[in-house]
């Protein structure tokens, strides 16, 4: 199975939570694992806001690169991500969730291009056929 790991899943993995243990097992058993480059930026921002030492941030980013193929934003991904974002935004309005971020669109768009399942606990992805819920 091909998977794409989103920010939510990485945060849980680095916390060492029960969900994080599940993420680790999913990554280890996957045929291929991906994460968009935007997820590295998103996690880096989160950790710097939380005043996590830079050395630890870099270690986590390196671990992500070691565990997954990092997918760049490409001319092929941009339209896929934009369409995915619009779908997520419409569903969020319907379900009365906060608006998704463009990062969410990049995650879903990249997963669709790779024909991969998104590993997440983010409510924006709940119920989608592309989701492995943690």
Show the residue positions of the predicted features.
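Residues that scaffold the ATP/ADP-binding catalytic core of kinase and kinase-like folds
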Residues: 13-14, 46, 81, 128
């Amino acid at each position: 199975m091909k998977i794409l790991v989103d920010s939510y899943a990485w945060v849980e993995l680095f916390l060492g939570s029960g969900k994080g243990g599940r993420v680790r097992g999913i990554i280890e058993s996957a045929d291929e694992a991906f994460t968009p480059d935007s997820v590295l930026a998103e996690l880096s921002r989160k950790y710097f806001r939380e005043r996590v030492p830079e050395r630890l941030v870099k270690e986590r980013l390196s671990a992500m690169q070691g565990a997954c193929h990092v997918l760049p934003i490409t001319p092929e991904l941009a339209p896929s991500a934009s369409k995915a974002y619009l779908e997520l935004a419409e569903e969020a309005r319907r379900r009365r969730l906060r608006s998704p971020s463009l990062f969410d669109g990049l995650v879903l768009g990249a997963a669709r291009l790779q024909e991969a399942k998104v590993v997440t606990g983010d409510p924006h992805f709940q119920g989608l056929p592309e989701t492995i819920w943690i």
